[in-house]
Amino acid sequence: MAGQEDPVQREIHQDWANREYIEIITSSIKKISDFLNSFDMSCRSRLATLNEKLTALERRIEYIEARVTKGETLT
């Protein structure tokens, strides 16, 4: 009986080692996913801010171009 328990014990230990490995991999994937989601939100926010600034600049340029075309002086 003692000889049969040894392989069983080995399988149990191997199973636990596999489960721990899977847990580590799963945890790492979750951390990467959380980071990527956070990075995505940060990039979207920054791009939205840049878009607003560019839109404001485009409007100012159009206004200045219109005044120059009409021959008005810029004051």
UniProtKB/Swiss-Prot annotation:
Gene Ontology cellular-component terms listed: cytoskeleton; lamellipodium; SCAR complex
Chain's gene name: Brk1
Lineage, uppermost ranks: Eukaryota, Metazoa, Chordata, Craniata, Vertebrata
GO MF term set: identical protein binding; protein-containing complex binding; small GTPase binding
Annotated organism of origin: Mus musculus
Modification sites for N-acetylalanine: 2
Quaternary structure annotation from Swiss-Prot or TrEMBL: Homotrimer when in free form. Directly interacts with WASF2. Component of the WAVE1 complex composed of ABI2, CYFIP1 or CYFIP2, BRK1, NCKAP1 and WASF1/WAVE1. Within the complex, a heterodimer containing NCKAP1 and CYFIP1 interacts with a heterotrimer formed by WAVE1, ABI2 and BRK1.
Name of this protein: Protein BRICK1
InterPro entries according to UniProt: BRICK1
Predominant location category: cytoplasm
UniProt record similarity statement: Belongs to the BRK1 family.
UniProt keyword annotation of Coiled coil present: yes
Segments forming a coiled coil: 41-72
Nucleotide-binding listed as a keyword: no
Compartments, as annotated in UniProt: Cytoplasm, Cytoskeleton
This protein's UniProt keywords: Acetylation, Coiled coil, Cytoplasm, Cytoskeleton
Function, as annotated: Involved in regulation of actin and microtubule organization. Part of a WAVE complex that activates the Arp2/3 complex. As component of the WAVE1 complex, required for BDNF-NTRK2 endocytic trafficking and signaling from early endosomes.
Biological process terms in GO annotation: actin cytoskeleton organization; actin filament organization; cell motility; fibroblast proliferation; in utero embryonic development; positive regulation of Arp2/3 complex-mediated actin nucleation; positive regulation of fibroblast proliferation; positive regulation of lamellipodium assembly
